[in-house]
Amino acid sequence: MSMPATSTKTTKLATSLIDEYALLGWRAMLTEVNLSPKPGLVDRINCGAHKDMALEDFHRSALAIQGWLPRFIEFGACSAEMAPEAVLNGLRPIGMACEGDMFRATAGVNTHKGSIFSLGLLCAAIGRLLQLNQSVTPITICATAASFCRGLTDRELRTNNSQLTAGQRLYQQLGLTGARGEAEAGYPLVINHALPHYLTLLDQGLDPELALLDTLLLLMATNGDTNVASRGGEGGLRWLQREAQTLLNNGGIRTPADLDYLRQFDRECIERNISPGGSADLLILTWFLAQI
């Protein structure tokens, strides 16, 4: 793979450190997809609301993406002297090349396009922070990623083109900003909600898988998931948020017996053809940042 982007200076980061963060990104993707049972999502039990996807597609995709994560980190480091708003344009060709490898690995199935965007941003942010000898924490990573995306929502969603993209249509109809808005805001759903929730459950001694499933419910209840809205409309999104919040209000996922509630939720999502893919992407970031 050749580096399809220019940069302003060479990186001084150790290859071992870069590979360590890339490995965490790969593990985050695998941890999310293997987590079971997940309502409407591909997992070890079934394909959720995705008739065109299988667990193995996600495994192959994650491996293909792992090879590109060091490139995002390296570009973040090499562009550390650039204005943060200028970094995103340099990341785009890396992301597109990574996306191409994902599609080749899955024979054309879109498994992790959202994760390429979000993990790519976070990896570039890590590279920039390391290069500048600044503290690498979940908060500084997300704040740096946000600085890369300044103005992104205005540029890409608030347009009046005659042919709207799916994201533009959902923004104009429902006010949903999706992955762009969450990134530009510094991932507040992760930093302020999902990550502290997950870490608190772990501190309380809850099984890590149960803690992650409960955190997924929290994200589903609070996230304006454009994946859900594109499949189920505003009604489908409100239904999903309401059902997830009801499960949380009733105690959440604390014991293996509680998994029966998730299995029933999964069946209902499949019947409605609803998949909370945006929340799954944020869960990947939550696990990733929890390791840092």
Curated annotation (Swiss-Prot):
GO MF annotation list: ATP binding; triphosphoribosyl-dephospho-CoA synthase activity
Catalytic activity: 3'-dephospho-CoA + ATP = 2'-(5''-triphospho-alpha-D-ribosyl)-3'-dephospho-CoA + adenine
UniProt keyword annotation of Ribosomal protein present: no
InterPro entries tied to this protein: CitG, TriPribosyl-deP-CoA_syn_CitG
Enzyme Commission number(s) from the entry: 2.4.2.52
Keywords tagged on the record: ATP-binding, Nucleotide-binding, Transferase
Disulfide bonds: none
EC class name: transferase
BP GO annotations: prosthetic group biosynthetic process
Signal peptide stretch: none
Keyword ATP-binding: yes
HAMAP family: CitG
Function description: Catalyzes the formation of 2-(5''-triphosphoribosyl)-3'-dephosphocoenzyme-A, the precursor of the prosthetic group of the holo-acyl carrier protein (gamma chain) of citrate lyase, from ATP and dephospho-CoA.
PANTHER family from the UniProt entry: 2-(5''-TRIPHOSPHORIBOSYL)-3'-DEPHOSPHOCOENZYME-A SYNTHASE, TRIPHOSPHORIBOSYL-DEPHOSPHO-COA SYNTHASE
Recorded family membership: Belongs to the CitG/MdcB family.
Protein name as catalogued: 2-(5''-triphosphoribosyl)-3'-dephosphocoenzyme-A synthase
